[in-house]
Amino acid sequence: MTDIPTLGVEEEFLLVHPGSGAPVALNREVAARAADMDVELQLELTSCQVETATAVVDDTAHLREQLLHLRRTASAAAEHAGARLLAVGLPPTLPHEFPVTDTPRYRDIGERYGMIAHEQGICGCHVHVAVPDRDAAIAVSNRLRPWLPLLLALTANSAIYRNADTGHASWRSVLWARWPSAGPPPHFDSADEYDAAVQMLSHTGVIRDDGMVYWDVRPSANFPTVEVRVADVPATVDETVLFAALVRGCVMTALEDERHGDPVLPLAPYALKAAYWKAARNGVDGDGVDLENHVPAPVSDLLGYLTERTRPALEAAGDHELVTAGLARVTDLGNGATRQRRAWRRNHDVDDVLAEAAAATLEDG
């Protein structure tokens, strides 16, 4: 295993009122200020969100530097516009509204999908890993399917929503699943079969365009990469780096397995759905589903198994120590959802959750 693929990361953030914590429609103002600071922010579907994107990097050290710089710049731009930047999967407090961003494409999506679009103030994280071609991206997608619930559990960061504990570590993933092309990707035998499926969804009007293929793994339409989209936006930079490193390890392992002709684990749809539900419900604080044996197992054990399964790739990329230390920290202290609940349970005061999320967003080590 000698080829170490490059990677890049996109993070979505929520803009909230610094006092009430309610989402605010200021993405254009924040993006304009960030542009003055030489950082390009993308506008998302709702006008209370912005997205950052790193450059293509070779290693996780440079990735971390970029992520921290982008979060700090976006936060400063938000503050200048009268908002606060939060790395949360969902707004912890009641939104005043989720107005759709005023572009032709987003207006059309708002009209087509109604409340699904207008309740879309949710934030995820997308990792792009370089692959040889689109057929390789599809092969990787097929092989990543059993690991997606674990990656969701690891990054869960949306336990508190509308001033209440949702009972789920990732309520974002539950809301996200309402889109017709969201969730785990189907198994495809080739890129041609994938393209035929996308064409069918588009031709029947189920999706507006190829950009609305929201499966949790997909070949990028714009880059020679496979894109893994299963995560809530992690609470901290270090958790994002951990997620990205583990995703790259999974992609490298999948490519190696494909080269060797190793069989793909067959997955019944009900089993994968069950594992997703457990991941969204429990995050890292409880059981997940062992999809090889169809039995419950502690998420910490399943993450340990995944680390060993991907160890050759992680070591080749120089990320094994980072991943093992990061997983130990998350297992011991919890992830974003754990932090949200810990803050909420102190006084059942959403201000505590907002303060915790704001601190985590810019946490450095």
From Swiss-Prot:
Signal peptide location: none
Recorded superkingdom: Bacteria
SUPFAM superfamilies per UniProt: Glutamine synthetase/guanido kinase (SSF55931)
InterPro entries xref list: GCL_type2/YbdK_subfam, GCS2, Gln_synth/guanido_kin_cat_dom, YbdK
GO molecular function, one term: ATP binding
UniProt record similarity statement: Belongs to the glutamate--cysteine ligase type 2 family. YbdK subfamily.
Protein name according to UniProt: Putative glutamate--cysteine ligase 2-2
